[in-house]
Amino acid sequence: MLVAFDFLDMNAKNITLRPGRPADAAKIAAMSRDLIETGLGWSWGPDRVARSIANKDTFTLLACDRDRVVAFAIMYFGDEHAHLNLLAVRPSHQRLGIGRHMVEWLTESAYAAGIATIHLELRAANYSARTFYRSLGFTESAYIPGYYRGREMALRMMRVLRRPGTPLPAWPAPKLPKS
C-alpha cells in the first residue's frame, strides 16, 4: 500500500504513506529516541518497535519523502478503543500537514474498524502538541503525574468516534444497476 496526498506545502509533494515493515524498526526507534523520548531514556528501542510492527493489533504508518522516513505513527487497535502510542515528524518536515494527514488516516481507519474512542498521552508541558490534537478533535481527559519515568506529568487526550457499546453505523447497501 502506498498512498500519496496533497499536502499543505509544495515542499512536501513527494511524501507517500506506507505501512511500517520490520526493516524500519531501527529508524523508527531512533526517531522516537531523538524526537519524542528526549531526556527520558529510551523505552521504544528497535526490539520494542519491531514487536509492535509484528503485532496484528498494532499498525505502524510511515511518511516517506522519496525513500527517507520523515514521520511515523504507531497505533494499537483494541475491540472498541485505539491508542496512539507514538507520533513523530522530523523537524525538517513539520508544519507541512504530514502529521495531520497521518492522524486523519488512522482515525478514519479506526472508525471503519468500529473503534469507539482513540486515546493518547503526551507530555503535559507540550502545548504545541495539545493544540495540534485539539485541532483534530481530541479533548483533554486526565493528567497523570509521574507518567514519564516518574519524572514528568502526562496529559491523556481522547477522541470519541462513537459511544462505546453502541452498534456500528450501518453501511448503505450498494445500489446495483437494474438489468
Predicted segment positions?
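Acetyl-CoA-dependent GNAT
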Residues: 2-12, 19-94, 103-105, 109, ...
